[in-house]
Design a protein with these regions (language model features):
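Juxtamembrane transmembrane-helix boundary signature
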Residues: 14, 41-72, 81-93
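Hydrophobic, small-residue-rich membrane helices and short re-entrant helix-turn-helix hairpins
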Residues: 26-27, 31, 137, 198-229, ...
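Flexible loop linkers connecting adjacent transmembrane helices
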Residues: 27-31, 54-77, 105, 109, ...
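Selective recognition of specific alpha-helical transmembrane segments in multi-pass small-molecule
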Residues: 40-55, 217-245
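Hydrophobic transmembrane alpha-helices that form the core helical bundles
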Residues: 62, 78-110, 119, 284-302, ...
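Transmembrane alpha-helical segments of multi-pass small-molecule transport proteins
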Residues: 83, 108-132, 147-158, 308-328, ...
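Membrane-interface loop-to-helix entry segments
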Residues: 130-160, 344-351, 376-383
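Hydrophobic alpha-helical segments and their helix-loop junctions in multi-pass secondary transporters
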Residues: 147-178, 186-204, 355-367, 390-399
Length: 399
């Protein structure tokens, strides 16, 4: 068992990318605004996304290639579609996770620099870490980060049931599927719960890069079930400390960071301030780092398939991603809530397309590689239908 835990790598990178905005921001917000009403959304999101997320490490370990190479087997049009989807979402995804991290840095250090400038510093730091250490640094950092976060979150969750909050009359919202506001939040919540659909592609790339691919599914399950548990814990923290109090979570990065830390310290006590501050920062920095590692690799992989060349341009895409994310933060959206909502909703709307591509790939190679069982294929099909139906429902509300 200890040997398996020591070998954990891509599964923790998955967890590092997943436990970030979706948990610290969206799950906490779901609990604060709707109480326990959206806990079912966390469970269903994990259930219906499971076959697609498991496909990443499974396909990589069985075929020896990433999902990018797998999608290329479906035709050039498919790989170009993947390139378009990735290019249309990557800048907002990176901008969203980086500005949340910047808010935590502002809270932790008291720096007077604006969130976009701190974001620039963070992305340069990520670039240097990945340039110097590559996969090993990411792998080793994640083991420490996930242990700190998991222990502190579970403890805060348990103690939050003892919090004596003041409930304000008529301040308890009830979720309504006919409400554009509530539907927008649901899609934003599910879009990144536990992570965007693209993470299966990232996971397949990390699995290929990992020294050992044999424990990839054990590795994945540890990360997957861990993110489900922590998602529920963060929702409960929001519900137990803020729901019904009339206190609204702030939209600015530093304002939200302050409230997030307060939620933990109210549950655990003032002694936990720096423990939580460090855990929250390391969690969000891990998300920023893993996204900054994965997205350029995906684009570079797409380039290799389209051009049929062996020369990777990951470093170039990393620079492009950093510049694009910073342009958004400096000149378009610096409000954390708007940035997160936009990125997560776009991820939800592209999810059914990515899910359909994965389903087609399984149909092509399942007999050869045994990628999905019958129940997983059926579950995936139901998931695709639900993703399309919710996307259509949302578009009908806003158009």
């Amino acid at each position: 068992m200890l040997a398996k835990l020591k070998s954990l790598g891509p599964g923790l990178l998955y967890a590092g990318a997943a436990i970030g905005v979706s948990h610290l921001v969206q799950s906490t917000r779901a609990g604060a605004e709707y109480g326990y009403m959206l806990i079912l959304a966390i469970i269903l999101a994990h259930v219906f996304k499971y076959p697609f997320f498991a496909l990443g490490p499974k396909y990589a370990s069985e075929s020896g290639e990433s999902l990018v190479a797998g999608y290329a087997r479906l035709g050039k049009g498919t790989i170009l579609l993947l390139g378009f989807i990735t290019l249309s979402t990557m800048f907002t995804v990176q901008a969203a996770v980086t500005i949340v991290t910047a808010g935590l840095v502002q809270k932790m250090t008291g720096w007077s620099f604006s969130a976009p400038w701190i974001s620039a510093f963070l992305l340069v730091l990520c670039f240097l870490i990945l340039r110097i250490g590559k996969f090993n640094v990411l792998d080793n950092l994640m083991k420490v980060i996930m242990i700190i976060l998991s222990i502190s979150t579970v403890l805060a969750f348990l103690f939050s049931f003892q919090v004596d909050k003041v409930v304000v009359e008529n301040s308890m919202q009830v979720f309504n599927l006919k409400s554009e506001k509530d539907m927008s939040f649901l899609l934003a919540f599910v879009g990144w719960m536990p992570a965007p659909m693209d993470i299966a592609i990232w996971h397949s790339i990390w699995t290929i890069s990992s020294p050992s691919k044999k424990s990839s599914l054990f590795d994945f399950r540890i990360g997957f079930y861990g993110t489900a548990l922590l998602g529920i814990c963060f929702l409960a923290l929001g519900a137990n400390t803020l729901y019904g109090t009339g206190v609204e979570l702030q939209s600015s990065a530093v304002g939200f960071a302050s409230q997030l830390v307060d939620i933990f310290t109210v549950s655990l006590g003032s002694w936990s301030y720096w423990l939580i501050m460090i855990a929250a920062f390391t969690t969000m920095f891990s998300t920023t780092l893993t996204c900054y590692d994965a997205l350029p690799r995906v684009m570079a992989g797409i380039g290799l398939e389209v051009k049929s060349t062996k020369v990777s341009n990951t470093k170039l895409w990393r620079i492009v991603l950093g510049i694009g994310a910073l342009l958004i933060l400096f000149f378009f959206v610096s409000n954390m809530r708007e940035m997160v909502n936009f990125a997560t909703i776009v991820s939800f709307l592209t999810a059914p397309i990515l899910a359909l591509l994965s389903y087609r790939l399984v149909l092509l190679r399942n007999e050869e590689l045994k990628l999905w069982s019958i129940w997983q294929k059926n579950l995936a099909l139901v998931g695709i239908v639900l993703l399309f139906l919710f996307s259509i429902r949302y578009l009908m509300l806003i158009l």
